[in-house]
Amino acid sequence: SGGSRAYLYAPSSVEIVSGTQTKDVKDTRMAPQGLLGARIYTVTELSSAYPAELTVRASWVAEPQTQEQERYAQAEAVYREFVFRNYTAVDKELAPVLQELFWADAQEDGDSIYSAVNRVRQVLSQRTETASDGTLSADVLDLLTGTGRGNAVLYASAAVQALRSRGIPARYVEGYYVSADMARSSASQAVTLTAQNAHAWAEVYFDGIGWLPVDVTPGYYFDAVTLQQMVALPDATHKTAAIDDAERDSSQAEGGGTTGKSPLQETV
């Protein structure tokens, strides 16, 4: 059946939503206003050539040059305090396991988000396998210390806990995965999303920037060598637009950016 009109399905890099009135549901997601929700709307988004973990904040964030920049910096600083109070808690049962598996041999002065994410991916890829037959680990603890059979939900959940245990604010996100190939092959036609396209990932808070998506599910991210090569390349940001029709459970996209994926998100 079609997607729920109570939710606004948009890429994580959304810039503008037009065609419907929206509201913020606390700091977790946007939602359409009105009892009937949204049927058709247009989303404009900014796709970067870099994956999120390579994002670097603008220099003016530390030293604002205009009143607008100053207002942004002040508001972000207030919200950042809220983020660190509410998105760094770790499950007590998992805490010692996370420390042993992910950070026992890490540097004491703390890792950058980039290196921490790479560490999480490395540990998960070495200790677990994707459960293609549907036989999953019971929970994150079982994934890390027991059967080691995961899917996107378990990988994202483990990553959130692991990053939080390193002092990095993170949260769990569910949505749909639209690959660049899907977007290109559809051209101006509809892309139909079903349960087969359901996905989960983590969002990590970058100081001065905000929440950005980070995927740790094997097969859904660039390897460490490719990431290092990307650092030397100039970034290019592309603006694309997509139309969502929740009643038909479809999405139309013009271009797919250059990131290789365009997740449509609901944050929980």
What are these regions (language model features)?
Residues 15-147, 166:
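Acidic low-complexity segments
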Residues 43, 58, 259-268:
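Hydrophobic, helix-length membrane anchors
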Residues 230-232, 237-263:
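Ser/Thr/Gly/Pro-rich low-complexity, disordered linker/stalk segments of secreted
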Residues 142-150, 190-193:
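Short, contiguous acidic/charged loop-to-helix segments that flank catalytic cores in large enzymes
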